[in-house]
Amino acid sequence: GLWSVGVGFSERRLIDAAIRQMEKLPVSHSFAHRTHEPSIDLSEKLIKMAPAKFSKVFYTNSGSEANDTVVKLVWFYNNGRGRPQKKKIIARQRGYHGITIASGSLTGLPWNHRDFDLPIANILHAACPHHWRYAYDGETEEEFASRLAGQLEEMILHEGPDTVAAFIGEPVMGAGGVIVPPRTYWQKVQQVCRKYDVLVIADEVITGFGRTGKPFGCLTYDLEPDILVLSKQITSSYMPLAAILISDELYQGIADNSAKIGTLGHGFTTSGHPVALAVALENLKVIEERKLMENAATVGKRLQEKLRGFVDH
């Protein structure tokens, strides 16, 4: 799979979970304050796994839909707090966030833009944190990370901090080339974003649920995002599902604006599909019971040690 089948193919427990849920409640929407047991159970599980600041979950069917939703929620949030000009979102060159109109614009790969008239307005792209490819001669990883953080600050100041809403990135870039950033890169980026009231969005569609040896890539890099986007391995891709986690602060701003308007005019027929959520719950149980995240950390360390033996070849 595409960084997505964590428990392997033909896992009977996931198949049986889908069958049980189809027999019990095969479909149910989540509009008008409706919910169901799989939604409650999975949301509680995700909140327990995630960093402490996250308290609310919104479900979509894919990472592309999730990142589209994040763009809308960020705009909705800022409109609600009287900052309608705070719309611009900074992504990164070589980053990948999906292929719908907004998420495809966030993606920083030219073939996802060409002849699709992308990116749309208010989407910007900062430099890619690929030290081996883009560092100056003799520039250390620490110096490289500082330079990129400085460039990000310059971009925000050039655009106007009151117009920049968020910065989005994958903790480790996937489709752009499996690019591992310098160790302090994310801390420096976060410091700049906090300085200018810019939300930090961690796209963990690939890195979530153990790919970096911890539940989420943001934990690996000591990153404290405001929004967490999850998909792929949440169900080991046996069912289409993505989840957006936000903090109480963001939720309250969105809820207050929804109350003024009368509703939050966003959602999908199959948002929080009960079968997908039931499969996700069983999938996370399998990952935990078989200690797959711990195994990724152990095997990853051993792989690195062995690869270093070839450094002079």
Question: Over which residues does each language-model region extend?
Answer:
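Conserved N-terminal phosphate-binding loop of PLP-dependent enzymes in the Aspartate aminotransferase
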Residues: 1-313
